[in-house]
């Protein structure tokens, strides 16, 4: 009987942790309401209000996630006045417990700890009290801000479902300003109410955000509201003539005879050596620091760092102009000017301006290798094939067996042919020849052939072609794609065995 109970327990636990639907049936928490309000005042100031009502459904919501038991509010005392309008917990029995005064704590945000220029920014921590199953946390606050310019991209998603999400922009009735907005609906329930001075967006029944790896950009997955109003600060204008004499020595140290490599070295220097203070630009009035300020302080926002890259490129003699996702840099190849797009948020390879973003990455390598694999037990040795620059980087260990979210992949066409010379003594044989060749409709093809030649060498052919629309693997295609990635990774190792009775020479 005891054995039957143990088996039943194991089966029950397996079904709970392996079911793709278990999260749907056991949410940790749920937002009844999220409301963001932007009210422009006649004196040129703005009131930014936020209200949330979140119901805690499981113990995990209380103990495992700091963002449920605590709320973090970023503000800049130099331009903002923060007011907590309401903060309380509604217990399961309906009683209200007000958040005590000692539960409001101001601190320096972690984003600003390594950047003295932004040490004036503060983070108000609200520690919610009286938390229990089925309680509802209510928080309502307003930030009164000097300045009325607004440029926000709001992705309407949280880490638990939202019953109702509202975005409101309210201008004075006699204002000459207008509200600019774009809304990405997707398959979600969204209603828009507007007149000449008011914009009101209501989204209902929003699911929680995906936690999968290799996700596409958030704005392509979830409903997104882009809103703007007011006069754009002049500081945001592109500084097309800004140079940086203070960085001339650094620029010289990064020099390379290949101009594109030289430009990339400058970008990489900024990414590696300038600390990122990653907070919303609205905290500093949408103003960017000069390239000199960012360089000398060793820190800046992503927008500051982009401006710095452009200025350092100009100091090095390149033509450089900023754009949304990086810098256009002009180099000379064979005497001809060529413009490349250089990302400034990560170390992506430079891309020729005008080339398709999802163009296939083509690799065709054929070369001889000398066996370089350790002993893995007894008379066996194992070698992992090299990872070539630019090759596909999808780790199947992060690909769950069931997936509902689309997967972002860079289309590729990779071909590798290796001939591996084995140790001369003793004689070695390939443990397991591999011969895989198949085509997955709408995804691509895979071919892996590992065999031993009559000469004793190991012959390896690996070919992978991924060609999916817009670089997106759909949930319907996912199972076949995952299998391709598993095979591509699994058969990247070659195992050999020494002839029986003869020891392996060396380690």
Regions found by a protein language model. Give the residues of each.
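Positively charged n-region of N-terminal signal peptides that target proteins for export
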Residues: 1-6
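C-terminal segment of classical bacterial N-terminal signal peptides
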Residues: 14-24
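A sensor for short, sequence-defined functional sites
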Residues: 26-507
């Amino acid at each position: 009987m005891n054995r039957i109970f143990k088996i039943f327990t194991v089966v029950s636990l397996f079904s709970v942790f392996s079911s793709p639907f278990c999260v749907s049936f056991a949410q940790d928490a749920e937002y009844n309401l999220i409301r963001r309000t932007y009210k422009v005042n006649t004196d040129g100031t703005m009131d930014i209000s936020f209200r949330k009502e979140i119901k805690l459904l499981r113990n995990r919501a209380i103990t495992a996630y700091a963002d449920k038991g605590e709320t973090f509010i970023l503000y800049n005392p130099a331009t903002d006045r923060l007011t907590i309008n309401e903060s309380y917990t509604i217990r399961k029995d309906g009683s209200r417990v007000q958040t005590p005064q000692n539960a409001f704590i101001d601190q320096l945000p972690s984003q600003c700890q390594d950047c003295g220029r932004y040490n004036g920014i503060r983070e108000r921590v609200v520690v919610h009290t009286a938390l229990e199953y089925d309680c509802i946390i209510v928080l309502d606050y307003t930030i009164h801000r000097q300045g009325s310019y607004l440029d926000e991209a709001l992705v309407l998603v949280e880490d638990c479902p939202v019953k109702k999400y509202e975005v409101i922009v309210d201008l004075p009735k006699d204002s000459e300003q207008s509200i600019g907005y774009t809304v990405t609906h997707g398959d979600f329930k969204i209603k828009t109410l507007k007149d000449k001075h008011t914009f009101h967006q209501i989204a209902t029944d929003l699911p929680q955000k995906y936690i999968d790896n290799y996700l596409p950009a958030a704005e392509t997955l979830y409903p997104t509201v882009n809103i703007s109003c007011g006069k754009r600060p002049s500081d945001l204008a592109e500084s097309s003539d800004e140079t940086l004499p203070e960085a001339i020595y650094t620029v010289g140290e990064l020099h390379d005879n290949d101009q594109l490599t030289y430009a990339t070295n400058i970008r990489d220097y900024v990414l590696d050596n300038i600390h990122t203070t990653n907070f919303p630009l609205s905290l500093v009035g949408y103003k960017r620091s000069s390239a000199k300020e960012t360089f000398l302080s060793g820190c800046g926002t992503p927008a500051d760092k982009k401006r710095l890259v452009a200025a350092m490129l100009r100091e090095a003699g390149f033509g450089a102009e900023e754009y949304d996702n990086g810098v256009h840099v002009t180099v000379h190849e064979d005497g001809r000017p060529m413009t490349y797009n250089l990302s400034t948020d990560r170390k992506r390879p430079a891309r020729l301006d005008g080339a398709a973003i999802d163009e296939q990455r083509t690799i065709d390598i054929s070369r001889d290798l000398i066996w370089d694999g350790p002993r893995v037990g007894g008379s066996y040795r194992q070698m992992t094939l090299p990872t070539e620059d630019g090759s596909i980087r999808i780790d199947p260990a992060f690909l769950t067996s069931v997936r509902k979210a689309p997967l972002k992949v860079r289309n590729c066409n990779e071909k590798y042919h290796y001939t591996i010379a084995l140790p001369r003594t003793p004689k070695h044989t390939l443990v397991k020849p591999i011969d895989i060749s198949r085509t997955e409709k709408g995804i691509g093809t895979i071919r892996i052939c590992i065999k031993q030649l009559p000469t004793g060498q190991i012959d390896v052919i690996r070919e992978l072609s991924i060609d999916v629309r817009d670089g997106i693997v759909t949930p319907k295609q996912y199972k076949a794609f995952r299998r391709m990635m598993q095979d591509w990774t699994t058969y990247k190792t070659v195992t050999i065995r020494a002839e029986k009775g003869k020891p392996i020479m060396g380690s």
